[in-house]
């Protein structure tokens, strides 16, 4: 499945997804975000059971504030509309998958 671009307009439908949700809060100018992006894309392609979305913190400041995002990249895992895991900084694929399983 492809990565969804998340914004204020489509966030509620993403939040209420039946599937676990992986959110990648990023900025275009952020070097570590560019390093993490292919890993997130790979997870989206490999895992049909997970909804993967990216949120540009410069365009969606309100969503970033709502999640307490102060640094990029930040990964958030949601299940049943609730945050179950959150992590700032670049993470290896195995650690991201562990966040999703936790």
Regions found by a protein language model. Give the residues of each.
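Conserved Rossmann-like nucleotide-binding pocket used by diverse enzymes
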Residues: 2, 26, 51-53
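A short beta-strand-turn-helix
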Residues: 3-20, 61
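Conserved helix-turn-beta segment immediately C-terminal to the redox Cys motif
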Residues: 18-20, 37-55, 59-61
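Short pre-active-site segment immediately N-terminal to redox-active cysteine/selenocysteine motifs
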Residues: 18-19, 26-29, 71
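Conserved redox-active cysteine motifs that mediate thiol-disulfide chemistry
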Residues: 25-39
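Structural micro-motif
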Residues: 67-76
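Non-catalytic, surface beta->alpha helical segment in thiol-disulfide oxidoreductase systems
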Residues: 76-102
């Amino acid at each position: 499945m492809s990565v969804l671009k998340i914004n204020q307009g489509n966030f509620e439908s993403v939040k209420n997804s039946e599937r676990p949700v992986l959110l990648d809060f990023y900025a275009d100018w952020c070097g570590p975000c560019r390093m993490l992006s292919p890993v997130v894309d790979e997870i989206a392609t490999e895992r049909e059971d997970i909804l993967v979305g990216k949120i540009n913190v410069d365009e969606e400041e309100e969503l970033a504030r709502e999640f307490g995002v102060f640094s990029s990249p930040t990964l958030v895992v949601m299940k049943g509309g609730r945050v179950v895991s959150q992590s700032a900084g670049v993470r290896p694929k195995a650690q991201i998958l562990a966040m999703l399983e936790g």
